[in-house]
Amino acid sequence: IGGWTGWSWNTNLIPEPTKLLQEIHDNGYKIALNLHPADGIDSIESPSYYKAMSRELEGKYGSDGKIAWYLDYPDFTKSFFDNVIRDHESEGVDFWWLDWQQHLTSPYTPGLGQTFWCNHVFYNDMVKNRPDRRPVIFHRWGGLGSHRYQIGFSGDALINFPTLAF
């Protein structure tokens, strides 16, 4: 796994993630985790999530130890949010910073803009499942109409003096 995806904590670096998130909240901050979801759910990196989703989805979206990313499909989406997102939110994650940059349109649903759909699904999940707070996500611009969902960011930037001088 190349470091751009994954759903579990590196406990060598963060041995007690829930405790860390609580300390951050105790200091008055909100917490967003940056997601690069395109590689799906890997059995090596995220074994508990992989097992739960694989059982629920009956192997439908993956083989060889990986569940592919199929946010277009309601059964995948429900299983993903129930098993992965709810778990992290129960640990203390307040909202999500999606960093989708793989496919402009879905390889499974013709004409469906992937960035727009990620914005729509994550935002509306928060509307439905976290009514105690104002829904918010960070994400890239997903095309016309997507401004209703996310606080946009322009993407990655080079961190050096020539870039600042521009």
Question: For each predicted feature, which ranges?
Answer:
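Catalytic-domain carbohydrate-binding cleft regions of carbohydrate-active enzymes
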Residues: 1-166
